């Protein structure tokens, strides 16, 4: 008995303190929720479950003290016999003795029945206790998950600006499972422990109050010490979690931006950033281990001291004939078990306390009522919206940057059915205006009205439903094309979808895809080209049949051909709708009814194209800038001959992925989502994780062997203390079963009491050392594993990240949970195992010496208990894997919704995501309920076995004593040594769930750590030539993306660029242009053919060396959430970049002045993924970043496509400056930007179709010529 308590005695005995004080104290030490609030989501059935479970737990708890009553009476029966055989001198007494022995056996049979009866009761109530509490918890957690997700979906955009997306995902997974841990069977165990406590004390007082009071005198000391430790511990737990949360955020950001990290060789830097955050968590963890173990050691010292005192006093009472020895034992054990049970309660209290902490954050978010409530039913829903819009004196600044005023008194009127174009420089408030109209934010002052009605009085959802939005970077969800369009409006029919798709000019390309409307678009739509995504987004907006259409640079990121098609679709869509267009390319807005010029947060001029050209204001300036430099660039808009388009669509399939890939660069960051949710869960379940042995896990910790040696030694000593206790205990009782004089009794009992005290001192020392050494080793291991896993993740090649199983969400979850779970299976757990083995081992050896017959009987029983434990472990381990997998599925849905929250909101699809999330929780929920029963059955069986073994043991013991084969003293010794030992083994089985999880986690970890990618970013092999001239050659290169092996991208591409030349790649969207850049960066290797650099094959070159000479600027640059200076310095991670260099690069990229104008200059943080900057600003920072590398080869992947005229002009100048003296490969949609390239190559269907200079190609009158004329035509 005593052992099982003592391990948990760890955080010990604080119960009394906590129960009473918790409310008061916790209030000051924010933030936890009150005890009853924890159960705010319990329905009546849950309450019933909890009630019945609690009753069962209380009955179960009383069983142990009751057994002590039986035990005491039984000891008296033995003792009365024990005093006889010594007088057995003659035959007469001999006969008399056999009567007595006969009577003893009879009595023992009765006691055996009592024991069995108690056991049978326990079998039933223990099952009810565990399964009912687990059921209640499973049901509540299911509700909490849904409520929490609902609450997140219900928040307004401003809330997301200030909350970290990664953190929300962690809360959804980790914090909710913490609540789960805290409100399930642990509470049942707590009530059980409390019942044992009260039961024990009641029996103690009724059977012998004097002794009880003496034992009680020591309890407050125990309670106090424990209470203090518990407080200290919980504060460490919080700090540790915070410390890891930071590291987790770093990991999420890095994995999301993995392409950027790889291209800039930032792995080392990121590893360091991650590692520094881990260091903090490790330090706190070690402190926590020390604290926990001092408290445990102290508790043991006090416990043994109380034994010493109790036995010393108890013997005095027996000698003075006040109590019988049986009474002393009953009182002693009942009170002791009672006191210990508080120790047992403590881990449960700790779990509950952790749960309260986790619930605080979660319930807070659930209770946070947004000021713009998208679920609200209130608000006016006009029957007929004409679409007259008015912005009156609008002032606004973003909640995350209140000091920066964006709009400063904006006034604008739009008549129903008009098209208004907003033009102006990047960052002047155009997009903000559109966001205010959708009520993603409310203005700080001023009114936005529709048909004269303040939009704040209109129902939010209704308002957003009458608005269709197409933005610059459309977000598609990881499902089919049809489903994506359905996100526009829920009850839309297939006919309506087809109609919308035709209007959006997307029907033809969809019908050419192998699965047509059921084609999966991939994470963030990664399998489609930009033009295709954009058209699907338009179809999605049209299917809503909106009264108001908002086009936020809907065509800026497209190439000429796609743009022509998309623009045509938009023009069709605008008919009869009030439309607000934001465009950088002014050609797209010439035919708007009103053009409004923005400057400095207000509208400075409005009128149509002709009027504004006469006014010669901002618009005029913008137009002139565009026409001067970019003759043709406007062209992108106009239609192409039908057959060209089909052609384009065919090819765009080929490399659908390529363009995408580029986009996904930035996108993937925002959307750790899987290819297809259905697939994710299924596949994940079949995932073959090689099983792994315990030793393999320990090996991970091998470098901490000195800690282990000390720890294991202490654990062995600790284990041996238990049998030592049994010996002393049986000797004490033995003193009274022998017929000796009082003086000898007094002397013996004093000696044994002293020995108890010595045991205490030893245990204090060994517990502390054991805990400290294993705790430290465990923390070092956790840190090392997280580091190794992260390091290994960063080492993988890009195709590994393309794999739907390795989305950002899935990987960050791995990092967060796996290492912690492995720690669970090493250090402290190993200590418990060693301790228990030592305990049973010494116990068995001693028992065999003192009474082999009884030992053998007991050893027959013990395995049954052990087997039950093993079965329990097996059942749970299968469960562990399934649990994890199933929740990953719902995690993906959640991450997708949270990451793309703006899109979800503007499509008013919060409800849809909630339903999907709820759907994905069904299976884990059903399994939780199933598990409750399994857990209940195994638990009750192991518990009840103990009582049955008591019955068998003492009945057989009586038989042996009667035959004079053993003395009662030895029966006790053998019994306590073996039974306590066995309980200790039960303890090992009780940690089954953790171990099962740890094995699964460890296999994952080892799988990741040992995975060597085909393109190894860390490899030191390969050539590192001293000079690099920059001659690039592609020879018959064949390639397709690993995730879509059936779609060829490059089909025998030949290209050559001489050093210092600028090569421009043009072609329709998805023809393989970006792929060229990715192959040169060695994100992928070609399937056939070779890429040469200065005549050497790139796969012969050292990867790091190769990438160090390439500078890349892509269409949607990814910035990290740190300062501008740090973002620029990221360009060269191989050295420390000085502030001068940073500024020089910034000047070259034309962004220095802008940075200097910011309040914090170069130390301004750019926000998550650079959200605090406009596109043009981000782009220039990205260019500065590429220049800091001083690359020999510059890769520009549509670096200016997403910019407005003014930014573009500036950026283009920066790029022209940057190209000087470098080999440069440019991918451009706007042909004006590449007229002066040394070589222009037209790619179609993955092959080169034409090449030459601008003039030569125009003379050929081929594909290039027609592209140029399309663009120029648009211009005129």
From Swiss-Prot:
- Can you cite an annotated GO cellular component? mitochondrial inner membrane
The biased composition feature labelled Basic residues covers: 660-670
Q: Which reaction does it catalyse?
A: ATP + H2O + xenobioticSide 1 = ADP + phosphate + xenobioticSide 2; ATP + H2O + phospholipidSide 1 = ADP + phosphate + phospholipidSide 2; a 1,2-diacyl-sn-glycero-3-phosphoethanolamine(in) + ATP + H2O = a 1,2-diacyl-sn-glycero-3-phosphoethanolamine(out) + ADP + phosphate + H(+); a 1,2-diacyl-sn-glycero-3-phosphocholine(out) + ATP + H2O = a 1,2-diacyl-sn-glycero-3-phosphocholine(in) + ADP + phosphate + H(+)
Task: Give the membrane topology, semicolon-separated if more than one.
Answer: Multi-pass membrane protein
What class does this enzyme belong to in the EC scheme?
Answer: translocase
Q: Name one GO biological process term.
A: phospholipid translocation
Q: Where does ATP 2 bind?
A: 1067-1074
All disulfide bonds of the chain are none
Question: Where does it reside?
Answer: Cell membrane; Apical cell membrane; Cytoplasm
Occurrences of domain ABC transporter (ranges): 389-625, 1032-1270
Could you say which residues bind ATP 1 here? 424-431
- What Pfam families would the database entry show? ABC_membrane (PF00664), ABC_tran (PF00005)
Q: Which residues carry this modification: Phosphoserine?
A: 657
What function does this protein fulfil? Translocates drugs and phospholipids across the membrane. Catalyzes the flop of phospholipids from the cytoplasmic to the exoplasmic leaflet of the apical membrane. Participates mainly to the flop of phosphatidylcholine, phosphatidylethanolamine, beta-D-glucosylceramides and sphingomyelins. Energy-dependent efflux pump responsible for decreased drug accumulation in multidrug-resistant cells.
Comment field (misc): PGP isoforms differ in their drug transport capabilities: PGP1 and PGP2 can mediate MDR, while PGP3 apparently cannot.
Subunit note: Interacts with PSMB5. Found in a complex with ABCB1, TFPI2 and PPP2R3C; leading to the dephosphorylation of ABCB1.
The family assignment reads:
Belongs to the ABC transporter superfamily. ABCB family. Multidrug resistance exporter (TC 3.A.1.201) subfamily.
- Tell me the protein's name: ATP-dependent translocase ABCB1
> Origin organism of this chain?
Cricetulus griseus
Gene name in the database record: ABCB1
């Amino acid at each position: 008995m005593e052992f099982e308590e003592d391990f948990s005695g760890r955080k010990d005995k604080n119960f009394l303190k906590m129960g009473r004080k918790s409310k008061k104290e916790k209030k000051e030490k924010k933030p936890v929720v009150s005890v009853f609030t924890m159960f705010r989501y319990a329905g009546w059935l849950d309450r019933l479950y909890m009630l019945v479970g609690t009753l069962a737990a209380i009955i179960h708890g009383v069983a142990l003290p009751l057994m002590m009553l039986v035990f005491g009476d039984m000891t008296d029966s033995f003792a009365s016999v024990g005093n006889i055989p010594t007088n057995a001198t003659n035959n007469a007494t001999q006969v008399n003795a056999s009567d007595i022995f006969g009577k003893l056996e009879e009595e023992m049979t009765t006691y055996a029945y009592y024991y069995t009866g108690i056991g049978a009761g326990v079998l039933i109530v223990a099952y009810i206790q565990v399964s009912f509490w687990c059921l209640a918890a499973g049901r509540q957690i299911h509700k909490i998950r849904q409520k929490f997700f609902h609450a997140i979906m219900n928040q307004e955009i401003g809330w997301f600006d200030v909350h970290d997306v990664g953190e929300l995902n962690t809360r959804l997974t980790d914090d909710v499972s913490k609540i789960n841990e805290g409100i399930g069977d642990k509470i049942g165990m707590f009530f059980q422990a409390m019942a044992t406590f009260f039961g024990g004390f009641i029996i103690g007082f009724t059977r012998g109050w004097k002794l009880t009071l003496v034992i009680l005198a020591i309890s407050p000391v125990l309670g106090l010490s424990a209470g203090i430790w518990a407080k200290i511990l919980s504060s460490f737990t919080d700090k540790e979690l915070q410390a890891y949360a930071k590291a987790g955020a770093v990991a999420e950001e890095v994995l999301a931006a993995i392409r950027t990290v790889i291209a800039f060789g930032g792995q080392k830097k990121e590893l360091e950033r991650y590692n520094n955050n881990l260091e903090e968590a490790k330090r706190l963890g070690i402190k926590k281990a020390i604290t926990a173990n001092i408290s445990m050691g102290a508790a043991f010292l006090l416990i043994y001291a109380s034994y010493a005192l109790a036995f010393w006093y108890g013997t005095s009472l027996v000698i003075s004939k006040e109590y019988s020895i049986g009474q002393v034992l009953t009182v002693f054990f009942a009170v002791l078990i009672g006191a210990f049970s508080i120790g047992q309660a403590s881990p449960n209290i700790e779990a509950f306390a952790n749960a309260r902490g986790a619930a605080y954050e979660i319930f807070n978010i659930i209770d946070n009522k947004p000021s713009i409530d998208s679920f609200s039913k209130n608000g006016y829903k006009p029957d007929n919206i004409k679409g007259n819009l008015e912005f009156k004196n609008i002032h606004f600044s973003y909640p995350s940057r209140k000091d920066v005023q964006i709009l400063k008194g904006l006034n604008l009127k739009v008549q129903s059915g008009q098209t208004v174009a907003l033009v102006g420089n990047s960052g002047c408030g155009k997009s903000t205006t559109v966001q205010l109209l959708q009520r993603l934010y409310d203005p700080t002052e001023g009114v936005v009205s529709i048909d004269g009605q303040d939009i704040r009085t209109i129902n939010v959802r209704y308002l957003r439903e009458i608005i269709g939005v197409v933005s610059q970077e459309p977000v598609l969800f990881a499902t089919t094309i049809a489903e994506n369009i359905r996100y526009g409006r829920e009850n839309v029919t297939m006919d309506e979808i087809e109609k919308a798709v035709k209007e959006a000019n997307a029907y033809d390309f969809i019908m050419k895809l192998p699965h047509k409307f059921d084609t999966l678009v991939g994470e963030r739509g990664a399998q489609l080209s930009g033009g295709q995504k954009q058209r699907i987004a338009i179809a999605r907006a049209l299917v809503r049949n909106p009264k108001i259409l908002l086009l936020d640079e809907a065509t800026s990121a497209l190439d000429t051909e796609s743009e022509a098609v998309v623009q045509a679709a938009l023009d069709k869509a605008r008919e009869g709708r009030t439309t607000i267009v934001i465009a950088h390319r002014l050609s797209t807005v010439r035919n708007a009814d009103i053009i409004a010029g923005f400057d400095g947060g207000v509208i400075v001029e409005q009128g149509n194209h002709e009027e504004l050209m006469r006014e010669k204001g901002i618009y005029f300036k913008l137009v002139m800038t565009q026409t001067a430099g970019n003759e043709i660039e406007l062209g992108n808009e106009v239609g192409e001959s039908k057959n060209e388009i089909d052609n384009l669509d065919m090819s765009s399939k080929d490399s659908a992925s390529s363009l995408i890939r580029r986009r996904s660069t930035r996108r993937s960051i925002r959307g750790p989502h899987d290819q297809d949710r259905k697939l994710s869960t299924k596949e994940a379940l079949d995932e073959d994780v090689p099983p792994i042995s315990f030793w393999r896990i320990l090996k991970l910790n091998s470098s901490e062997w000195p800690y282990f040696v000390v720890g294991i030694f202490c654990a062995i000593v600790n284990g041996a203390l238990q049998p030592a206790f049994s010996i002393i205990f049986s000797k004490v009782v033995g003193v009274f079963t022998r017929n000796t004089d009082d003086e000898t009794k007094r002397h013996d009992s004093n000696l044994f009491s002293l020995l108890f005290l010595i045991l205490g001192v030893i245990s204090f020392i060994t517990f502390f050392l054991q805990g400290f050494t294993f705790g430290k080793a465990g923390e070092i291991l956790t840190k090392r594993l997280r580091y190794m896993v992260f390091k290994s993740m960063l080492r993988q090649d890009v195709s590994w990240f393309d794999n739907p199983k390795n989305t950002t969400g899935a990987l960050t979850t791995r990092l967060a949970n796996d290492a912690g779970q492995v720690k669970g299976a090493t250090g402290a757990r190993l200590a418990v195992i060693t301790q228990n083995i030592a305990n049973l081992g010494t116990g068995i050896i001693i028992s065999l010496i003192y009474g082999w017959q009884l030992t053998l009987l007991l050893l027959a029983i013990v395995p049954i208990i052990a087997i039950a434990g093993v079965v329990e472990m097996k059942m749970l381990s299968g469960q562990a894997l399934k649990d994890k997998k199933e929740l990953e599925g719902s995690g993906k849905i959640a991450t997708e919704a949270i990451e793309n929250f703006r899109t979800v909101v503007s499509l008013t699809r919060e409800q849809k995501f909630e339903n999907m999330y709820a759907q994905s929780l069904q299976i884990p929920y059903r399994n939780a309920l199933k598990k409750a029963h399994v857990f209940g059955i195994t638990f009750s069986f192991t518990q009840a076995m103990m009582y049955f073994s008591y019955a068998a043991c003492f009945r057989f013991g009586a038989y042996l004593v009667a035959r004079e084969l053993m003395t009662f003293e030895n029966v006790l010794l053998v019994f306590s040594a073996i039974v306590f030992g066995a309980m200790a083994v039960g303890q090992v089985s009780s940690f089954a769930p953790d171990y099962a999880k740890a094995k699964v986690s460890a296999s994952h970890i080892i799988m990741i750590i040992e995975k060597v990618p085909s393109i190894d970013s860390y490899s030191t092999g390969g050539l590192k030539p001293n000079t690099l001239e920059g001659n690039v050659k592609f020879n018959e290169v064949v390639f397709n993306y690993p995730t879509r092996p059936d779609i060829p991208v490059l089909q025998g591409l030949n290209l050559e660029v001489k050093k210092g030349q600028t090569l421009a790649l043009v072609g329709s969207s998805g023809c393989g242009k970006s792929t060229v850049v990715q192959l040169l960066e060695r994100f992928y290797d070609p399937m056939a053919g070779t890429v040469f650099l200065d005549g050497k094959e790139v796969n012969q070159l050292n990867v790091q060396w190769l990438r160090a000479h390439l500078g890349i600027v892509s269409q949607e640059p990814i910035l990290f959430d740190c300062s501008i200076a740090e973002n620029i310095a990221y360009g060269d991670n191989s050295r420390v970049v000085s502030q001068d260099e940073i500024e020089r690069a910034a000047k070259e990229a034309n962004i220095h002045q802008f940075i200097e104008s910011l309040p914090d200059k170069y130390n301004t943080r750019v926000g998550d993924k650079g959200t605090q900057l406009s596109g043009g600003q981000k782009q220039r920072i990205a260019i500065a970043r590429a220049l800091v590398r001083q690359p020999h080869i510059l890769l520009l992947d549509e670096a200016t496509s997403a910019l407005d005229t003014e930014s573009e002009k500036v950026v283009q100048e920066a790029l022209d400056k940057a190209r000087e003296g470098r080999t440069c490969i440019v991918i451009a949609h706007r042909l004006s930007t590449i007229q002066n390239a040394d070589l222009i190559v037209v790619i179609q269907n993955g092959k080169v179709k034409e090449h030459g200079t601008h003039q030569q190609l125009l003379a050929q009158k081929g594909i290039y010529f027609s592209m140029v004329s399309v663009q120029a035509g648009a211009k005129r």
